[in-house]
């Protein structure tokens, strides 16, 4: 697994529950503020783009499945100006990577692997 596809580093919030953040950082979530050490979108885009380009060069003309957290996918979609839509659980997004092109990454639509309610509670 390539660590460059990891979830956003949330700094001092790492390991805390939503309730703990609300208690210890009142108003931060509602105001969309971030604590010290919270990874910037630029940092995420830089590391994920480098990882995608490396894969494209390793498998030229091939298709590769990358599993990443929805937060990382949303940051990449925002960076490429295709929206900030929610990524459903077990959903994803296609990224077409052409290392030698002017536009290295082209972003596709959000996809759902399963229709809502199609998966039973056994998962």
State the predicted function of each range.
Residues 24-43, 123:
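Short glycine/proline- and acidic residue-enriched helix-loop micro-motifs
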Residues 72-74:
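Short, active-site-adjacent cap segments at secondary-structure transitions
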Residues 13, 24, 58, 79-80:
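Residue-level signal for well-ordered alpha-helical positions
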Residues 55-62:
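Glycine-rich phosphate-binding loop signature in dinucleotide/nucleotide-binding domains
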Residues 1-23, 29:
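Phosphate-coordination/substrate-recognition cap region in phosphate-metabolizing enzymes
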Residues 62-70:
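Generic beta-sheet signal
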Residues 108-123:
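Acidic, His/Gly-rich catalytic cores of divalent-metal-dependent hydrolytic chemistry
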Residues 81-107:
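Domain-level recognition of soluble alpha/beta enzyme cores
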